[in-house]
Structure formats: structure tokens, C-alpha cells
Regions:
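Short, conserved beta-strand element in jelly-roll/cupin
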Residues: 93-108
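Ligand-binding loop in jelly-roll beta-barrel domains
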Residues: 129-154
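Glycine-centered tight beta-turn/hairpin loop motif at sheet-sheet or coil-to-beta transitions
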Residues: 21-23, 113, 141
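Motif-centric detector for short Cys/His coordination patterns
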Residues: 1-81, 85-88, 106-109, 120, ...
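Residue-level marker of beta-strand positions
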Residues: 25, 106, 124-127, 133
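Short beta-strand-initiation
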Residues: 13-15, 94-96, 121, 131
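Short acidic-glycine-tyrosine-enriched beta hairpin
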Residues: 113-131
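Short, surface-exposed charged micro-motifs
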Residues: 17, 98, 135
Length: 155
């Protein structure tokens, strides 16, 4: 899945890492002849690449970035599911959705670029990357927890 470069930082070994709009970090090394990224060497080169896309395999694998914090926690029980979950919604850049089914079963439809149908049963966890349209269907209504994770907000 293509994600936008929003920033850079150095890892513990001094290698550049691109921070993507999904909040995953991806190394952007210049190691010819294997990896040819001369732009990473200079500040001007890195700045020129801000806003460009990189493929994020961790989003493809639905992996929540480790450094995110819980932003919101909602418990949905006995059919009180927010209507926008049935109609379809997508979170903003950097905000992940976690669904934990407690009772019943739900089906989650993920839009492009993932285009997948996930079935969740009790104690199953679904992770939905930022900016991916998703909708939920179920009959009968399940009980589940809906959580949103994102970067730590300044205090």
C-alpha cells in the first residue's frame, strides 16, 4: 500500500528512516548497487522527497505501529453500533482502528487498496490502517470494542 513520506528521523545506528503517513517508519538507505537513493544523503534531497509515496508492507499486513497511543475507546453493545460503521468510513492519516469482538460475529469490508473481507468472531482483533474505507455488517448485532490509535498528542 502506498503511503506518503511526512518526516524523517535517524535510527539508533544513524540510518535515515522515513516516517510515513500511516505512522510506520521505513529505512531509506542509499547503498548502491543494491539500493539507489542518493536523495537521502542531503537535507535538500530528503526535503524534496517529502510528500512522495513509498510502499508500506506493514500496512499490507495490518500491523499497528508500536509507538501509537489509544485516542478513543467505544463499547458497542446490543445493536448500538454507530450508523457510520455500516455506511462506511475511513480514519484520518495516522489514525488506526482496532475492533475487538466480544460476542457474536461481524464482517468488515475493507476498501481499496486492500479490498478485503474480514470475518471476526469473539476475541478476534481486526486492525484497519488509516485512510482505508471500511464498513461493518452483522446480524444479529455483535458486542465489540472500537478503538482508535494515533501519535501522542502534545500536552
Amino acid at each position: 500500500m502506498q503511503r506518503t513520506i511526512i518526516d524523517y528521523y535517524l535510527d539508533e545506528e544513524g540510518d535515515w528512516v522515513a516516517l510515513l503517513s500511516c505512522q510506520h517508519g521505513q529505512h531509506v538507505r542509499h547503498q548502491p548497487p543494491f539500493v539507489n537513493r542518493p536523495w537521502v544523503i542531503t537535507q535538500a534531497g530528503r526535503d524534496a522527497m517529502l510528500g512522495s509515496g513509498l510502499n508500506c508492507v506493514r500496512c499490507d499486513r495490518l500491523e499497528l505501529p508500536d509507538h501509537l497511543v489509544l485516542l478513543q475507546h467505544l463499547e458497542c453493545r446490543d445493536g448500538d453500533m454507530p450508523p457510520e460503521l455500516r455506511a462506511g468510513l475511513a480514519t484520518q492519516a495516522g489514525v488506526w482502528t482496532r475492533i475487538l469482538v466480544q460476542e457474536g460475529q461481524l464482517i468488515c469490508h475493507l476498501g481499496e487498496p486492500l479490498a478485503n473481507r474480514l470475518i471476526a468472531t469473539p476475541l478476534a482483533e481486526l486492525m484497519i490502517p488509516p485512510e482505508v474505507l471500511y464498513s461493518i455488517e452483522s446480524d444479529p448485532p455483535p458486542s465489540f470494542i472500537l478503538e482508535y490509535y494515533g501519535p501522542q498528542r502534545p500536552s
